[in-house]
Amino acid sequence: MSRYTGPRLKIIRRFGGLDLPGLTRKRPKNTNPPGMHGAERKKKSEYAIRLEEKQKVRFNYGLSERQMIRYMRKARRSKGSTGLALLQMLEMRLDCIVFRLGMAPTIPAARQLVSHGHIEVNGQKVTIPSYGCKVGDVITVKNKESSRKLVAAYAEYPGLFLPDYLEFDKEKLRGRIKELPPREQICAPVNELLVVEFYSRKL
């Protein structure tokens, strides 16, 4: 299953108007799922509930199913909570870090910045959105007028709160990762335990 590139508000409606900040900052006027008129909904099976949680993660972080499986396998090999390890790996992707720093309004916009060569990590240009950042990494904008103007305009966009595990100098357009993100500062409205349960029968 490839990464979703269709209408984003349609996905938000599918989840009853749930806020997925990585996908879009817009809000639909109608929060009923597409094709459903009125508020009546069928009771979901346990499988459907787990599937929905998995899909929330996929759409919020802009992942393909193949990428999800790869991250899940890595998370299962890590120490501690598999669910937390999964979310931390996703949050430490370069496109997500750029988004959390406020350099882009959404993860898709951050992904475009990275792939077009506007972002550097520790002084080196990185064009892979899935690049796994590490604690201590310094994320900056390429020292080019067009790059700095683009990110400066994005930085004026009313974004999410800057989490404590990051620091950002708005004048220099420079960010640094201070520590791994704790669960309470990961703005992903998902139940990661259900995501782990979903894949436990598949991997």
UniProtKB/Swiss-Prot annotation:
Gene Ontology terms: biological process: ribosomal small subunit biogenesis; translation
Annotated protein name in UniProt: Small ribosomal subunit protein uS4
Keywords noted in UniProt: Ribonucleoprotein, Ribosomal protein, RNA-binding, rRNA-binding
Keyword Ribonucleoprotein among record annotations: yes
Gene name of the record: rpsD
GO terms of molecular function: rRNA binding; structural constituent of ribosome
GO CC aspect terms: small ribosomal subunit
Residue segments, region Disordered: 20-44
S4 RNA-binding domain residues: 92-155
Lineage: Bacteria, Bacillati, Cyanobacteriota, Cyanophyceae, Synechococcales
Role this protein plays: One of the primary rRNA binding proteins, it binds directly to 16S rRNA where it nucleates assembly of the body of the 30S subunit.
Family recorded in the similarity comment: Belongs to the universal ribosomal protein uS4 family.
Record-linked PROSITE patterns: RIBOSOMAL_S4 (PS00632), S4 (PS50889)
Assembly: Part of the 30S ribosomal subunit. Contacts protein S5. The interaction surface between S4 and S5 is involved in control of translational fidelity.
SUPFAM superfamilies assigned to the protein according to its UniProt record, in alphabetical order: Alpha-L RNA-binding motif (SSF55174)
Gene3D superfamilies xrefs: Ribosomal Protein S4 Delta 41, Chain A, domain 1, RNA-binding S4 domain
CDD domains in the record: S4
One Pfam family it belongs to: S4
